[in-house]
Amino acid sequence: MSDNPEMKPHGTSKEIVESVTDATSKAIDKLQEELHKDASESVTPVTKESTAATKESRKYNFFIRTVWTFVMISGFFITLASGHAWCIVLILGCQIATFKECIAVTSASGREKNLPLTKTLNWYLLFTTIYYLDGKSLFKFFQATFYEYPVLNFIVTNHKFICYCLYLMGFVLFVCSLRKGFLKFQFGSLCVTHMVLLLVVFQAHLIIKNVLNGLFWFLLPCGLVIVNDIFAYLCGITFGKTKLIEISPKKTLEGFLGAWFFTALASIILTRILSPYTYLTCPVEDLHTNFFSNLTCELNPVFLPQVYRLPPIFFDKVQINSITVKPIYFHALNLATFASLFAPFGGFFASGLKRTFKVKDFGHSIPGHGGITDRVDCQFIMGSFANLYYETFISEHRITVDTVLSTILMNLNDKQIIELIDILIRFLSKKGIISAKNFEKLADIFNVTKKSLTNHS
C-alpha cells in the first residue's frame, strides 16, 4: 500500500499549498512595492510644486506685510506732525473701523438680512456714544464760536440731556424692532454692541483725552506696545520653551519676560527722545496747532529735573549722595511695566474672540496684517491705563482760560456775563493795567449795555 503512488498525494498537497501561499505572498509584496513606487513617483512632483508655491506665497505675504508696515508708520508720523486734530481723527477712524469689524465677526450675517434695523441700531448707538463721550471734550475748543449761534449754544449747554434723549430713542427703536423667532439673536446683538462700545469706544475716548493732555501721553504708550509686541516675538522664537497661555499657543513665558526687559529699556530711550519737545509735552489749547506751531507752556514738574537723595549705602560705595533726574523716567518705567504685563492680555482677549467665532483675522482692511482690530487690540487697554495714570499721578488740574470761559458760557446769562466783565475791568483798573481814562470809557459802555439789557428783558 505504501508503494502505491495514489497514496502520496497527502504529502504532495501540503507542499503545493505551502508553495502557493509563498508565491501569493511574494506576489502581494511585489504588487505593494510597485504600487508604493508608482504612488511616490506621482506624489513627489506635486509635493515639490506645492512646497515651492507655499514659499512663494510666504515671500509675497512678507513683502506685502513689510510694505504696509512702512506705510502705516509713515502715515502715523505724518498724522502726528499734522497736529492734535488729525490725531483725534485717526483715533476716531480706528475706533469706528474696530467697532465695525467686531460687530461683523460676532453677528450672524444671514439673519441680519431679515432684520435691517439691527445694523442701523448698531451704528446709531455708536455715534450717540461718540457724541456723548467726545463731544464734551471737544466742544470747549469751539465754545466762543458756538455761543454766537443760539441753536449751537443750546446743544452745547444741554449736551448730557440731549445724549440721554438720543440713547432713549435708540432703546425705543430696539424694542419696536423685536420680532418673534429672532428675539435671542436681537438681544444677543444688543449685548455685544454694548460690550464693544465699552471696550472700544470708551477706551478710545480716554486715548483722545491723552492727545489733549499732550501728544507725549499718546505717543509713548503706543510706542511701548509696539516695542513689546516686537520683542515678545523675537525673544519667543529665540528662547521660548514654556507656553504662556492656552488661548495663544505661540506665546511663551520667555518671550513675555524678555519683552518686559526690552520694553523697560525702550521706555527710557523714548522718553529721552520725546521729552525735550514742548510740542509733545504741552497740553493743547488750540486744535489748529501742528508741529510747526510754536507751542509753549509751563511744563508739568515731571518734565523738569529734580534732585533725589540716595540711601547712605550708595554714598559709602560710590561717594554719590544724590542724583538729578526727570521724574518722567520713573513714570515711563511704570507705563512700560503695564505695557509688558497687562496690555498683551488685550491681544489674548482678541485671540479668544477670534477662536470663538472661528476666524483668523478680524478683517482684511490692511493687506498682510488683517483688520484694524488685529493691530490695535492692545492699544485700547494701554491707552485707557495711560489716561487714568496721568489723571491720578501726573495731572495738576490747572485752570486754563478755556475751562473758565467754558464755565462762564455754560452757566451765566448775558446780564451776569456783563457784570463779570465789569468787575474784571475794575480789578484791572485798580492794579493800574487799565488807565483811568480808558476805565471811564469802558464804564460808560457797560452802563449803556446794562440799560439796554434791562429794557430788552
Swiss-Prot record:
<protein>
    <recommendedName>
        <fullName>Phosphatidate cytidylyltransferase</fullName>
        <ecNumber>2.7.7.41</ecNumber>
    </recommendedName>
</protein>
<keyword id="KW-0968">Cytoplasmic vesicle</keyword>
<keyword id="KW-1133">Transmembrane helix</keyword>
<comment type="function">
    <text>Supplies CDP-diacylglycerol, which may play an important role as both a precursor to phosphoinositide biosynthesis in the plasma membrane and as a negative effector of phosphatidylinositol 4-kinase activity, thereby exerting an effect on cell proliferation via a lipid-dependent signal transduction cascade.</text>
</comment>
<dbReference type="GO" id="GO:0006658">
    <property type="term" value="P:phosphatidylserine metabolic process"/>
</dbReference>
<keyword id="KW-0812">Transmembrane</keyword>
<feature type="transmembrane region" description="Helical">
    <location>
        <begin position="188"/>
        <end position="208"/>
    </location>
</feature>
<keyword id="KW-0256">Endoplasmic reticulum</keyword>
<comment type="subunit">
    <text>Homodimer.</text>
</comment>
<feature type="transmembrane region" description="Helical">
    <location>
        <begin position="154"/>
        <end position="174"/>
    </location>
</feature>
<dbReference type="GO" id="GO:0004605">
    <property type="term" value="F:phosphatidate cytidylyltransferase activity"/>
</dbReference>
<keyword id="KW-0472">Membrane</keyword>
<dbReference type="Pfam" id="PF01148">
    <property type="entry name" value="CTP_transf_1"/>
</dbReference>
<dbReference type="GO" id="GO:0070319">
    <property type="term" value="C:Golgi to plasma membrane transport vesicle"/>
</dbReference>
<comment type="similarity">
    <text>Belongs to the CDS family.</text>
</comment>
<dbReference type="GO" id="GO:0005783">
    <property type="term" value="C:endoplasmic reticulum"/>
</dbReference>
<feature type="transmembrane region" description="Helical">
    <location>
        <begin position="214"/>
        <end position="234"/>
    </location>
</feature>
<keyword id="KW-0594">Phospholipid biosynthesis</keyword>
<keyword id="KW-0460">Magnesium</keyword>
<dbReference type="InterPro" id="IPR000374">
    <property type="entry name" value="PC_trans"/>
</dbReference>
<keyword id="KW-0808">Transferase</keyword>
<feature type="transmembrane region" description="Helical">
    <location>
        <begin position="71"/>
        <end position="91"/>
    </location>
</feature>
<feature type="transmembrane region" description="Helical">
    <location>
        <begin position="330"/>
        <end position="350"/>
    </location>
</feature>
<keyword id="KW-1208">Phospholipid metabolism</keyword>
<dbReference type="InterPro" id="IPR016720">
    <property type="entry name" value="PC_Trfase_euk"/>
</dbReference>
<keyword id="KW-0443">Lipid metabolism</keyword>
<dbReference type="GO" id="GO:0005789">
    <property type="term" value="C:endoplasmic reticulum membrane"/>
</dbReference>
<keyword id="KW-0548">Nucleotidyltransferase</keyword>
<feature type="transmembrane region" description="Helical">
    <location>
        <begin position="255"/>
        <end position="275"/>
    </location>
</feature>
<keyword id="KW-0444">Lipid biosynthesis</keyword>
<dbReference type="GO" id="GO:0016024">
    <property type="term" value="P:CDP-diacylglycerol biosynthetic process"/>
</dbReference>
<dbReference type="GO" id="GO:0046488">
    <property type="term" value="P:phosphatidylinositol metabolic process"/>
</dbReference>
<comment type="pathway">
    <text>Phospholipid metabolism; CDP-diacylglycerol biosynthesis; CDP-diacylglycerol from sn-glycerol 3-phosphate: step 3/3.</text>
</comment>
